[in-house]
Amino acid sequence: MNKMFVIAQMERAHTDAVAHGLALAKQLNKQAEVFAYTYAYLSGADRDNPRLAGVAQKALMTQQEKQLQAHLDTLDAEDVPLHVIWSKYLFEHACSHAQRHGFDLMVKAVHHADHYLPTDWQLIRHTSVPLLLLTNNPLNNGQTTLISIDLGTRNPAKQRLNDAVIAHGKQLAKATGTKLHVAYVLRIPQIVRDMDLLDINALVKKAYAEHKQKIAEIGVDADCMHIITGEPELCLFELACRLKSQYFVVGARQRQGLLGRIIGNTAEEILSRMRSNVLVIPTEE
């Protein structure tokens, strides 16, 4: 293990995943390999000519390889393995290859600073290894790693996911020299808050008392433990912005089949707002 799968899409990405990924690989003591994806359609009569299609494919892959190898050379990383893949669907090859060949972290830059594209969501939904999505946003320039966990769950699968998020968050914070912050959201709809039917402060104090032992096990300072109330997607976004979190770590329960394609889970609602570099820790249902 200790292998990092770096996806290079330099011409379209919002930030340089290769440079950031290789720097992070050194911090995490992982062996990085770079994967570049390319694919193109031929139009008209040319699309039915296998020989011409093969020539075009080879030319595109060679061009991509030369560009990336030159970039690796500028980073003093000429020895880092480079693979150029001809694939229509990036996520299918990346998820399968990473799992089969023992990679334990996948790194990719997002295309836009303010939202993910379908390929990013497909990776989130299908990856079996942790996925780090990088952005270059001025909101994430703080020295903070924020993790989100569900302290109130009694579901064994969610509890295991909590532990995985904590472990990866600690490892990332230590490697990057950032301060670890932990967030737990008591989900209370805004309409209930507006009706003033609940004593919010009492609920927060009760949560701190109930989860005192787990908080102590995590080992963060008191001012780095945040129990907040509201809708997770909004609360966590606001907290990450306030902390200027460089990294945000969240667990994602992956849904397969039609249900997973139609109904986004809480993690996806959170990620649709987040502006930090996001580390997604997957789990199977």
What residue spans do the PLM features occupy?
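Gly/Ser-rich helix-loop-strand patches that form or flank binding pockets
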Residues: A94-Q143, A240-E285
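Charged docking surfaces used in two-component/phosphorelay signaling
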Residues: V84-H93, T229-E233
